[in-house]
Amino acid sequence: MLTNKRLQNFVIHASDGDLGYVHELYFDDETWTIRYLNIDTGGWLGGRRVLISPFSIIRTAWDALRLDVALTKKQVEDSPDIDTHRPVSRQHEAAYLGYFGFPYYWGGPFLWGTAYYPSGVAVSDASSAETLADRVGRESADSHLRSTGAVTGYHIEAADGEIGHVDGFVVDDETWAIRYIEVDTRKWLPGKKVLVPPAWIEGVSWTDSKVRVGLSREAVKEAPEYDEFVPMTREYENRLYLHYGRPPYWLHDAEPASPYALSGV
């Protein structure tokens, strides 16, 4: 498990050198899975920000705070230029994925289309598939991508009132699913942080910056405290799910992904 805060210290290393460091993450708001890492390339690309898909990640070097990717610097330099300061459309995603020969993650029943893990998806020769123009033309404009930076600070509302705000995200570095939202309750419960799985979200108002969860404030108050500086253990996760009386995610990990109820305005 990794937090988005820790990932922001990671360097992205290509086969022929460093690409830059992680600036923030993009996730889709239907399955709450990280789809891209927004990379600050520093000076070698004139300050250009580029996107890196988990499809390309081959190793996590924990001690070195580094993610190794199966790409070259030239590939990244020649990749479609996406303005990361504006919403990323599905057409932009299709152009990006097509350039690298990656499949569409939205084209199957699992988190990564035909596979549960991005590492289990084969890279294809884009030239052997249908033309990019045809592929892009069939895609909708909205890709449901949100950045961790933009959603941090959203208010969290329980069934009976506000309980805190989004302070971070805990990410599974194998599936790249967001396992937990880190909730800072210090304005209501001084000094305490707790975790809430995205599956328990009942709705999000993107215009009002609010996340509604199907929990009571009392349930959150009595939940096991979360310490972001202590490594996540299965024992802690078990205590969390036992407290809430809900089945853990690992009991249905291999099942086809079904979008969480995240309708909002």
Q: Which ranges hold each PLM region?
A:
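Peripheral interaction segments used for macromolecular assembly
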Residues: M1-V265
